[in-house]
């Protein structure tokens, strides 16, 4: 009788393990299945890493960034996943971050040149105050092509930090149309340079965006 009870309990634990394994999450097999294409795209563009973006790190395992939340330019709460559908360069920045301020014009020019149905730059400001300061900064340097998205709780940065992507600011992630990581970079870059644009164009082609 004791043996039968023990076997039943073991079977129940086994079934629970199967159920938990089947639930998608940050490290679950659901993420692996949903974002395997991001890793394939990363492999396809490996030869484009270098020059101005030599520090760009390609995704070696599936990473889903769709749940990263922020407030869009219209003041509505949203997520990266809700705005998926094209290759996107997600850039976390703050007004107190000098390298962030320096690279913002390059991101603006990149959006002006490549932005459209297949690609977009998605900046997320993580200043902890209201949006007045970052808005004034963008206006002062005449940013015309980028929206002011905000995350004063810094949850986006904390999420990327927990995923091993963010060491500081700025941090930039290239994601595919399903919000799956293709690669990321810590520190500033000349994002409108020939090297960066070649990498992004290759990602768009490889991802089928």
Predicted feature locations:
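N-terminal targeting signals for export/organelle localization
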Residues: 1-65, 209
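Short, solvent-exposed cationic patches
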Residues: 27-28, 102-103, 200-209
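A short beta-strand-turn-helix
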Residues: 57-62, 67-88
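Conserved redox-active cysteine motifs that mediate thiol-disulfide chemistry
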Residues: 84, 92-109
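Alpha/beta-hydrolase fold active-site loops
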Residues: 87-88, 119, 170
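Structural recognition of the beta-strand scaffold that forms the well-ordered cores
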Residues: 91, 122-123, 147-150
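Structural microenvironment flanking redox-active thiols in thiol-disulfide oxidoreductases
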Residues: 101-142, 153-160, 198
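Thiol/disulfide oxidoreductase modules built on the thioredoxin-like
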Residues: 141-145, 151-202
